[in-house]
Design a protein with these regions (language model features):
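Short, solvent-exposed coil/turn segments at beta-strand boundaries
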Residues: 17-18, 83-88, 94
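Hydrophobic residues embedded in beta-strands of well-ordered beta-sheets
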Residues: 40, 88-89
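Short, low-complexity, polar/charged sequence segments that are solvent-exposed and flexible
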Residues: 62-64, 78, 109-113
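Short, surface-exposed beta-strand/loop micro-motifs that present aromatic residues
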Residues: 74-83
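Surface-exposed amphipathic alpha-helical segments
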Residues: 91-136
Length: 136
């Protein structure tokens, strides 16, 4: 598998090998939302490059305790994937259509990655060692 490691937020995530070269990652830190959240966006690169969204999922990392019934970000559907003393990590799926509606091949490629989401959810590990300090 491919390993994505985020030292700032103290977590790693395994992705299936067939994701190699197909995924683009955008990292946003210190968002002005719920006492300073962090959001890592994973895109299906070919769909995103085509200007058609392509968001596979987000990893939200927020200080404090959050649950699936009370997530820090309301849009989409969140699953708690890890919890440390200071942070909750959630995998959030987009609430709108992100696959290509014009190119069936692109749509199929996107869907094949989405179909492996359960693998991702069970392969996210928080180290508890974050570089950013939680807001007091």
């Amino acid at each position: 598998s491919i390993l994505y490691v985020n030292h700032q937020l103290g977590f790693s995530m395994e992705m299936p090998l067939n994701w190699m070269g197909q995924v683009e990652v955008e990292e946003e830190y210190g968002l002005h939302h719920q006492n300073g959240g962090n959001c890592i966006t994973f895109y299906h690169k070919p769909t995103h490059d085509n200007g058609e969204g392509g968001i596979l999922f987000f990893i939200d990392c927020y200080p404090g305790e959050w649950s699936e019934d009370n997530p820090p970000v309301i849009a989409g559907h969140s699953v708690v994937v890890a919890q440390t003393e200071n942070y909750t990590y959630l995998l959030r799926t987009p609430s709108d259509v992100e696959y290509s509606e014009s190119d069936p091949m692109l749509a199929e490629a996107y869907q094949s990655l989405i179909a492996q989401q359960d693998f991702i959810i069970s392969h996210i590990y928080a180290t508890g060692q974050t570089v950013i300090s939680p807001n007091e």
